Amino acid sequence: MSENLRSQVVTQGVQRSPNRAMLRAVGFKDEDFNKAIVGIANGYSTITPCNMGINQLAQRAEAGIKTAGAMPQIFGTITISDGISMGTEGMKYSLVSREVIADSIETACTGQSMDGVLAIGGCDKNMPGAMLAIARMNIPAIFVYGGTIKPGHYNGRDLTVVSSFEAVGQYSAGKIDDKELLEVESRACPGAGSCGGMFTANTMSSAFEAMGMSLPYSSTMAAEDAEKADSTEKSAFVLVEAIKKQILPRQIITRKSIENAISVIMAVGGSTNAVLHFLAIARAANVELTLDDFETIRARVPVLCDLKPSGKYVATDLHKAGGIPQVMKMLLAHGLLHGDSLTISGQTIAEILADIPEEPSANQDVIRAWNNPMYAQGHLAILRGNLATEGAVAKITGVKKPVITGPARVFESEEASLDAILAGKIQAGDILVIRYEGPKGGPGMREMLAPTSAIIGAGLGDAVGLITDGRFSGGTYGMVVGHVAPEAAVGGAIALVEEGDSITIDAPARLLQLNISEEELARRRANWQPPAPRYTKGVLAKYAKLVSSSSIGAVTDLDLF
């Protein structure tokens, strides 16, 4: 089979002489025009530590593709730093960047008739953005994670960027002074790599490894370690073989492999954002997936790993303990993975895991033994009720009692809620309602790490609930419910909550309820008026116009025609 199935339209024949002329300028020789052209989607950026080491990986991928007998072409794609934009208007662009990344990779690869793509990403939206493009295009592809950051250290404890967010709450509550705040700030992010706990970036990279679109062990490697660059070069060889064999993404991204990915997300205690992203990825791959599927998997999969944000360890500790393959083997041994799922190497999941022990080493406590999990069931629960008729996503970890009924404290923006928390105006038993932060209303569905971290820092993590039509950072934990749908901007019930209303969050019962009569709810709905758009031009205006409900992945290409 020809290896340049797609690129031959720009490299073959007399009419393509001008095309070849330009390719010669970027290094092609006579013998190269019959080779596969492989794109390297390079997320390198000095905006964020998550992506600042990626250029070296792109260069290793380039060398590997050449050695494997194909022609690499590097092109850039963007990133937003969620950690730096957190708590600001800039965070509205974070989820938007998922679509920009997907569109840019699809545009470059399809516009240049590439035969395959190796995508390298670091910060949170790089992963789903790349996978959306890969699923849409359905050309041979592999994802390479830029790698995780190593932990910082202070006073005998490991630090991540979330430590710094929580320190703000501790400082405002008078628990630490200026010196300690600065010490945490200065030590939290010691080098290159994505945020170190089982936050969104590490969650998505782990899920892609479980799904078969990244190489084994690659999702938990440190960005600065030599094995990460070695794994990138190996990924290049695997991709060129996949091009030769025409192993396509939609042969890998199937219902079974997505179930595998979700099972691993539950087992490692991953981010709520994975729900949103996999709904979108499944749609791009023409796989049926709903919120109810997450709930079904949650009910049967335990949380096996003691990882931050609510646990003790970081991703590099998981790597030393056996990484994602060890977690997967435990799930496979107990009938919770589909071993016959194909991977990018051409092997099945069962074949890859054949030599992995069924139980983790007894000399570590990052991965718990099967009979001693962190939680007996998954931590990402799908709640419904009159406040979320389409559903909401709860991450109930690090709290003693997963049920709360309390008075609503209503805020029309993240900033207003944070001001109230830092001013000491939130009391134990309150339920914060942060609304008009959904996909359309924000727009952009900002992450609420600043307020949730401030709550934790103030010592209220066990005593306060928070619901929002926005999202949460993977670094969030506590009694938090996000992705409330329908969102406020389209008249969802969250828009109808009034200060002091009684609200119940009941994770075991999967309930999110506004405790008022149906008659009163109907009266409020009749009086509700949609707010004016916050943006009327530019990318946020376009996004608000196109984006769908979070309950179906907040996609922007639904029902366009």
Curated annotation (Swiss-Prot):
It comes from the Bacteria. Its cofactor is [2Fe-2S] cluster; Mg(2+). Its EC number is 4.2.1.9. The active site is at S473 (proton acceptor). It is an enzyme of class 4 (lyase). Coiled coil: none annotated. GO terms for molecular function: 2 iron, 2 sulfur cluster binding; dihydroxy-acid dehydratase activity; magnesium ion binding. Pathway: Amino-acid biosynthesis; L-isoleucine biosynthesis; L-isoleucine from 2-oxobutanoate: step 3/4; Amino-acid biosynthesis; L-valine biosynthesis; L-valine from pyruvate: step 3/4. The modification N6-carboxylysine is found at K125. The keyword DNA-binding does not apply. The keyword Metal-binding applies. Mg(2+) binds at D82, D124, K125, E447. It holds the Pfam family ILVD_EDD_N. Homodimer. Functions in the biosynthesis of branched-chain amino acids. Catalyzes the dehydration of (2R,3R)-2,3-dihydroxy-3-methylpentanoate (2,3-dihydroxy-3-methylvalerate) into 2-oxo-3-methylpentanoate (2-oxo-3-methylvalerate) and of (2R)-2,3-dihydroxy-3-methylbutanoate (2,3-dihydroxyisovalerate) into 2-oxo-3-methylbutanoate (2-oxoisovalerate), the penultimate precursor to L-isoleucine and L-valine, respectively. This is Dihydroxy-acid dehydratase. It comes from Nostoc punctiforme (strain ATCC 29133 / PCC 73102).
